[in-house]
Amino acid sequence: MHAIEEIKQLTETINEHNHSYYVEDSPSVPDAEYDRLINRLKQLEGENPHLCLPTSPTQRVGGMALAKFDQITHLKPMLSLDNVFSEEEFEAFYKRISDKTSEAPTFCCEPKLDGLAVSILYRDGVYERAATRGDGTTGEDISENVRTILSIPLKLRGDNFPPLLEVRGEVIMPKKAFDALNDRARAKGEKLFVNPRNAAAGSLRQLDSKITASRALGFYAYALGVVEPETWALADTHYDQLMQLRAWGFPVSAEVKQCGDVSSVVAYYTDIMTRRDSLDYEIDGVVIKVDSIEHQGQLGFVAKAPRWATAFKFPAQEEVTLLEGVDFQVGRTGAVTPVARLKPVFVGGVTVSNATLHNADEIARLGVKVGDTVIVRRAGDVIPQIVAIVADKRPDDAREIEFPDTCPVCNSMVERVEGEAVARCTGGLFCEAQRKEAIKHFASRKALDIDGMGDKVVEQLIDKELVESPADLFKLTASAITMLDRMGMKSATNLVAAIEVAKTTTFSRFLYGLGIREVGEATAANLANYFKTLDKLKAADAESFIKVDDVGTIVAQHLTHFFAQPHNLEVVDKLIEAGVNWPEIEEVAEESLSLKGQTWVLTGTLTQLNRNDAKARLQALGAKVAGSVSKNTDCLVAGEAAGSKLTKAQDLGVKVIDEEALLQLLSDSE
């Protein structure tokens, strides 16, 4: 037998044995025979390295360590799920969706795995890449690490699969693997992982994939992502699509079940919760999805979650501990939040020493005092909070919790706006606590987008008193930046250059970067297009602000308060003096808004026009620029390497133009 033929045969045979062992939990050969096969394959590949196949099981051991993870933009956003915490909340969810479907919905239920969500892409049935969920739009490229997970197929089984297939699922660390990992760490005197989820996340995000390969991670598929061509015939229920994934070689939870009505869903939830501790992986609830793909389409999505699915979370775990004190933290928007200092207690898999008390109203509602014995809960198994006090254990020397009248950071007055529960520092950018978060926000990707200006850099700049306001960023020199940890002259020079580039921005990004409460990207764009100039916006009153699209009385109040603060105006003026600028937004008559009422989408790489500039100029002509193609899209601008959005636009009959046509349109409109 020729070497290539034997390599192919061994690769296929060993992958089948791996599937039997890691996916079906049914070993098909003795360990000695498996070892003989794998050693023979290694020998042949060593003698013929040019014949090694990308699907070879020997490629799962990990490769060269990376300097950092690259970013991957998901072909379709990876959305999160809304939660329900009781049978009553689930019944309300059911009523909401049943009113919107053509017939009573049925469900597909599965355990809510407590791991890390990932997207895996296959092209022509062969593993190509994998990414973390990230912010839902962009994730980290963890392709080499995911390749090491033995339960994930490198080549799909069978031959009836689409040319391009995206699979979504959860990477987990089984409880046995977690215990073994901590046993090894304990023997070496190393720090232990607190729970399997943290261990899975830490293992998957190792820059050295060899470390990931040693961690015995597992994977369960829970959904299809992008499938191309879109006309590819798929099952018409979520359950049957999961069974198709299983047939292609993916692990799918054995606990997946179809449920016909509310009572059967609740019974499933109760059963899984009862058996929770006996499962080999950590879960924190069950996921309930409308089973019919047609019904899913009828229900659609809200901003960041599908309407047709929800996570039915288990009751949060609670413990009793002592409230030893209360600290007050100040956030980017000036919110003063009381944080309870607790006698450390193990709750829901982690040691908790702090818990939120939210605000003064919550403190009053609980009637809590320093020195009280309190009940701590991890709400949704994530955020620790105090839910009650044990009144009969209150000591005689228990002390009232006094909310500060002045900011604990800058001593500015603390005020509480009528109708709001949150108290806020009025120091604005003068306040160091707000300053750190404000400068991080100002430099962020959606604001001035200063490349290399990460959170740790900002914190060091402020701690070393090199920067006090956003305007000070533009005074930084390379020699000053080298004072920061891990900043050599080359990195410092690059950062100074990036700051210089960021001086030229857009009015809307500048406004967004100021961090005015409740002024997001869309509102900032509306304000920029309405007022056109900074001077006009600064001179506006609440009545003028309310005339802007999507600006109500509360946002108008935040705007007037911000521009009424002398220190905020001083920062804005210093930014302009430092050279921050943007293209002038010309006055446009209503009849000149040639794209008013239209929805446009940008896709692919634009070579002559910055994407943000293109978006701003389209908005200046009255267009709404959306992130995805639908039947309501009026036009798609397709740059180089346009992908699934272009295909969808063509299928829907949406008008498509290239970058040259866009430039011509913008030129004709000026």
Curated annotation (Swiss-Prot):
GO terms for cellular component: cytosol. It catalyses: NAD(+) + (deoxyribonucleotide)n-3'-hydroxyl + 5'-phospho-(deoxyribonucleotide)m = (deoxyribonucleotide)n+m + AMP + beta-nicotinamide D-nucleotide. GO terms for biological process: DNA repair; DNA replication. GO terms for molecular function: DNA ligase (NAD+) activity; metal ion binding. Keywords: DNA damage, DNA repair, DNA replication, Ligase, Magnesium, Manganese, Metal-binding, NAD, Zinc. InterPro entries: BRCT_dom, BRCT_dom_sf, DisA/LigA_HHH, DNA_ligase, DNA_ligase_CS, DNAligase_adenylation, DNAligase_N, NA-bd_OB-fold. Its EC number is 6.5.1.2. Its cofactor is Mg(2+); Mn(2+). Residues 590-670 form the BRCT domain. The active site is at K112 (n6-amp-lysine intermediate). The keyword Repressor does not apply. Pfam families: BRCT (PF00533), DNA_ligase_aden (PF01653), DNA_ligase_OB (PF03120), DNA_ligase_ZBD (PF03119), HHH_2 (PF12826), HHH_5 (PF14520). PROSITE patterns: BRCT (PS50172), DNA_LIGASE_N2 (PS01056). DNA ligase that catalyzes the formation of phosphodiester linkages between 5'-phosphoryl and 3'-hydroxyl groups in double-stranded DNA using NAD as a coenzyme and as the energy source for the reaction. It is essential for DNA replication and repair of damaged DNA. Belongs to the NAD-dependent DNA ligase family. LigA subfamily. This is DNA ligase.
